[in-house]
Amino acid sequence: MKKAFLGPVLLACLTAFACATTACGDSPEAKAPAPPAPVEPPPAVTPPPAPAPPPEPTAEEKKKAEQQKQLAKDRAESEAENKKEVARWSPELKKEATALVDKQFPNGKAAIQGAMASKARKPGHADRDKFRHPAETLDFWGYKPTLTVLEFVPGEGWYTELLAPTLAKKGKLLATNTDPNGPADDRSSYYGQVFKMFLDTSPELYGKVETVNIDNKAPKLPQDGTVDLVILARELHGMVNQGKMDVWVAEIQKALKPNGVLGVEQHRAKPDAKPEESAKNGYLPEKWVIEKIEAQGFKLAGKSEANANAKDTKDYAGGVWTLPPSFREGDKDREKYAAIGESDRMTLKFTKVAKAAPKADAKPATPAKPAAPATPATPATPATPKKP
């Protein structure tokens, strides 16, 4: 009886177990996971070609980049120096400057000597008096505190600080300057900024100075027969280097009154020097300078050796800027160049005269009747051309 009952039960248990293990009759093959689809490899990407290296700067581009670098350095140094100069102007110094402007002097030389002794002068400027002899030089040119004076390219104001206070009451000082608001990468704009900063340091001394903006690309002076004295100090070589000497001297002649004076101080080259070459080093031959200026409506009225220096050999690789105050070589042989001092300079006085009128063209002669043709002669040997 028990065996008969256990048989069906055992069969049912086996069936249930089989059903559980096979998911109730589904075949193992039907429930097996499908294999993953093959993954396509990513398409090959060709990297873009490397950019071509920038072209090598040309020699001119390198030169310009170096010039801009030097300009930035010079500007930074000038601005730093100006900050020190502004800070130097204490109330006591301003008071002394005002007193100098108000002081009365018996003559021009005494006025300049009074300005030379002032503490208002920029530090270091008085150290150059022994080389530049301003009282003797200006007296030679006929300077008086009642004149209208034009200082042509005053640089950093070495003469300006002597002229401005002594002309403020009864005279007038005009000073040329380049546009300080010109392009930042233009060195002429920088020079204009330097002089403007100089004037702005002391309204007491320089408040009455009238600046005359000039453009070397279009040389022009607005003054016409109104100036007594033009001071052209250490600037002629720059005019020559830029090919502008004749036109600027002509403009100066036009600005002067009849019999007005042009005072020239210029680094003096050796007599046999070629002007176009020596000008690159800052020097010009004296005889040539006189001839060129007289050709523009001037007459030489006198020479002075106040600024002569026989120690100047004029043969430095760095030109006249090798000497003080520039010391282009830095500390190299500095003592040697300091012992020489500033350059040997011509000091000339010219007076304005009427320009020679150009010769009128000769009236053409009445053409003669053509002569009978002559027998051609043997051609002559051509003459040897003259040297330029």
Predicted segments with their positions:
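Bacterial signal peptide processing site
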Residues: G25-P28
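Class I SAM-dependent methyltransferase Rossmann-like catalytic core
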Residues: A110-K144
